[in-house]
From Swiss-Prot:
Mg(2+) 3 binds at residues 437, 441, 445. The Asp-Asp-Xaa-Xaa-Asp/Glu (DDXXD/E) motif is important for the catalytic activity, presumably through binding to Mg(2+). GO terms for molecular function: alpha-zingiberene synthase activity; magnesium ion binding; terpene synthase activity. Its EC number is 4.2.3.65. Belongs to the terpene synthase family. This is Alpha-zingiberene synthase. The keyword NAD does not apply. It is an enzyme of class 4 (lyase).
Length: 541
């Protein structure tokens, strides 16, 4: 009889009793009324801001405080006007405006999908084609340049140089800094650029940072804190409902060998779909995340190769009449996943008149096939080439399932042309998730004897050391972000889903930046979840 492996996963610290104890007063009507009054004041503030730099800085603050979505109509008009004043081919005037203005304008516009050329920075370069050394003392300008460089696309060498130049001088500034606030700002940027950060987590940091500044606007601070607390109250109610649902499934008892990461799965879904009004999509995505985790552990840890082959065939046929061919734990999992998938397809058919069951089924089939391929590699002791591994692993990372599920539950009406675009881009979008996961979990998973990851495959291909392989994977991540900047930000293949698609990369970077933030109770992940779901912002009303 084939022995079963055990990953010895630690139990989640987020049990149902704790989750049900979460409570917030910020769902009350008086807070909603106060928020509306503050929004009116901010709208007036936006209307009265005329200077171009002040407008850009205000929009930047609104975005980082997490409240810009309340004023999108106003901010979009401002950005259209600013972009419309572009002087074709004349970049010298940017030097007069300064590096901070030029870089901030570049980043804010590119974030919104405007085709701002990298040549706007040419006026800050000398005849040799290097950035002028006189810029090395411009702290604000360098931070803005560094942040802007992460909006680059493939082949934009000026922005590559901008990243290297600003990074070099910002690291030196941190070493020599006497102003703690300035040092903290630089360190924050260097740890993770703004373009790759999770919106809600950035808001937590930036509210505290901005509030302590001499130029902080108290109305913006109050609205940001109040809005955060109100959305947190929404998250708490969703999390409590999901925890009750998970308890009722009995999956934790029946699949005791697996990771049961309800709160962590909710953090994933929140990172991808943060908007308070998208609760339906967020909760469905969390359920799907829970199923993915269980299926992953069945293939990676517990199932025998013979059982996994039968499970894969039954998922391919999508036929519950074949359940008796499976052991009990697989029957329970498949039936629950099967019913939930069909239920989601029914709700979409009922509400939108479009049948997506074949799409949803196809995603689970593709995922299970890739899981089975990796299981056969493990059982045969086979190390794939890096290319062979990534072709399978970008799917087994579960990005396509997450992206399509997110699209189906946040988009109305569902557009067939957008679905075709998502099919073209899903694997590439999933690659950042896979590579970030491998960087964070590779060491732990190799200790468990899992299939080699990108790092080990590249080491096997080239004979390089682990650190060189890690640097290679980081370069691959950078390349995928550049591709996403072009394919998603600039080309806008989806009317409203582009930010959500980009968010998959952001939450991936967040979860795995300090190791495996999902597989086990992790101090960094715990800190993030407490800030997002438990602790409200201090505010006096």
């Amino acid at each position: 009889m084939e022995s079963r492996r055990s990953a010895n996963y630690q139990a989640s610290i987020w049990d149902d009793n704790f989750i049900q104890s979460l409570a917030s007063p910020y769902a009350g009507e008086k807070y909603a009324e106060k928020a509306e009054k503050l929004k009116t004041e901010v709208k007036t503030m936006i209307d009265q801001t005329r200077d171009e730099l002040k407008q850009l800085e205000l929009i930047d603050n609104l975005q980082r405080l997490g409240i810009c979505h309340h004023f999108q109509d106003l901010t979009k008009k401002i950005l259209q006007k600013i972009y419309g004043e572009e002087r074709n081919g004349d970049h010298q005037h940017y030097k007069e405006k300064g590096l901070h203005f030029t870089a901030l304008r570049f980043r804010i516009l590119r974030q919104d999908g405007y085709h701002v050329p990298q040549d706007v920075f040419s006026s800050f370069m000398n005849k040799a084609g290097d950035f002028e050394e006189s810029l090395s003392k411009d702290t604000k300008g360098l931070v803005s340049l560094y942040e802007a460089s992460y909006l680059s696309m493939e082949g934009e060498t000026i922005l590559d140089m901008a990243k290297d130049f600003s990074s070099h001088h910002l690291h030196k500034m941190v070493e020599d800094a006497t102003d703690k606030r300035v040092a903290n700002q630089i360190i924050h940027s260097l740890e993770m650029p703004l373009h790759r950060r999770v919106q809600k987590l950035e808001a937590i940091w930036f509210i505290q940072f901005y509030e302590c500044g001499s130029d902080a606007n108290p109305t913006l601070v109050e609205l940001a804190k109040l809005d955060f607390n109100m959305v947190q109250a929404t998250y708490q109610e969703e999390l409590k409902r999901l925890s009750r649902w998970y308890e009722e499934t009995g999956l934790q008892e029946k699949l005791s060998f697996a990771r049961h990461r309800l709160a962590e799965a909710f953090l994933w879904s929140m990172g991808i779909i943060p908007e308070g009004h998208f609760g339906y999509g967020r909760m469905h995505l969390m359920k799907i995340g829970a199923y993915i985790t269980l299926l992953d552990d069945i293939y990676d840890v517990y199932g025998t190769l013979e059982e996994l082959q039968v499970l894969t065939e039954i998922i391919e046929r999508w036929d519950i009449n074949l359940l008796d061919q499976l052991p009990e734990y697989m029957q329970i999992f498949f039936l629950y996943m099967f019913n939930s998938t069909n239920e989601l397809a029914y709700e979409i058919l009922r509400d939108q008149g479009i049948n997506v069951i074949s799409n949803l089924k196809g995603l689970w089939v593709e995922l299970s096939q890739c899981y089975f391929k990796e299981a056969t590699w493990f059982h045969n002791g086979y190390t794939p080439t890096t290319e062979e591994y990534l072709n399978v692993a970008c799917i087994s990372a579960s990005g396509p399932v997450i992206l399509f599920s997110g699209y189906f539950t946040t988009t109305n009406p569902i557009n067939k042309h957008e679905l075709q675009s998502l099919e073209r881009h899903a694997h590439s979008l999933s690659m950042i998730l896979r590579l970030a996961d491998d960087l964070g979990t590779s060491s732990d998973e190799m200790k468990r004897g899992d299939v080699p990851k990108a790092i080990q495959c590249f080491m096997n291909d080239t004979g390089c050391c682990e650190e060189e392989a890690r640097q290679h994977v980081k370069r691959l991540i950078d390349a995928e972000w550049k591709k996403m900047n072009k394919d998603i930000l600039m080309e806008k293949p989806f009317k409203n889903f582009c930010p959500t698609a980009m968010n998959l990369g952001r939450i991936s970077m967040s979860f795995y930046e300090h190791g495996d933030g999902y597989g086990g109770p992790h101090s960094d992940t715990k800190k993030k979840m407490v800030s997002l779901f438990v602790q409200p912002m201090n505010i006096t009303i």
